[in-house]
Amino acid sequence: MTETTPEGIVNPPIDQLLEHVDSKYRLVLFAAKRARQINAYYSQLAEGLLENVGPLVETTNQEKPLSIAMREIQAGVVEAHEMDAEEIAAQAAAAQEAPAIELDDPFADLADPNA
C-alpha cells in the first residue's frame, strides 16, 4: 500500500522551504539550529529550566526535532535573520560590558573568625 502524503525529508517539500530562505545552505543551518533549540527544550523540560522555546507547531509522538523545525519554517512561525557587522559588534560589546558571571566572592564581607 502506498502513502498519499510523502514522509521524511521531502515533507515539507524543499521548494516550499526555500521560499523562506535564500539558499539551501542557509536552510540547513537554520533548520539545524532550530532543531538543537527544540532538542534542548525537551532536555530541559524535566529539569524545569525552560530556557529555550518549545515547538511552535503541533507535534506527534516520536517526531524528530529536525522535522519539527522544518515544519515551523514552512509555516512561517520562525524567521531567519542575518546579522550585519554592526549588529555583531554591538552584541559583542554588550557582552563584554556585562559579564554573565560575577567573580566577586560573596563571603568577602564576612569577618575572618581567626582574626
From Swiss-Prot:
GO molecular function, one term: DNA-directed RNA polymerase activity
Listed InterPro entries: DNA-dir_RNA_pol_omega, Pol_omega/Rpo6/RPB6, RPB6/omega-like_sf
Biological-process GO terms, alphabetical: DNA-templated transcription
Enzyme Commission code(s) on record: 2.7.7.6
Alphabetically ordered keywords of this record: DNA-directed RNA polymerase, Nucleotidyltransferase, Transcription, Transferase
Keyword Nucleotidyltransferase: yes
Keyword Ubl conjugation (UniProt): no
Reactions that this protein is recorded to catalyse: RNA(n) + a ribonucleoside 5'-triphosphate = RNA(n+1) + diphosphate
SUPFAM superfamilies noted in UniProt: RPB6/omega subunit-like
GO cellular component terms given for this protein: DNA-directed RNA polymerase complex
Signal sequence bounds: none
Matching Pfam families: RNA_pol_Rpb6
Top-level enzyme category: transferase
General function of this protein: Promotes RNA polymerase assembly. Latches the N- and C-terminal regions of the beta' subunit thereby facilitating its interaction with the beta and alpha subunits.
NCBIfam families: rpoZ
Similarity comment: family membership: Belongs to the RNA polymerase subunit omega family.
SUBUNIT field: The RNAP catalytic core consists of 2 alpha, 1 beta, 1 beta' and 1 omega subunit. When a sigma factor is associated with the core the holoenzyme is formed, which can initiate transcription.
Name under which the protein is recorded: DNA-directed RNA polymerase subunit omega
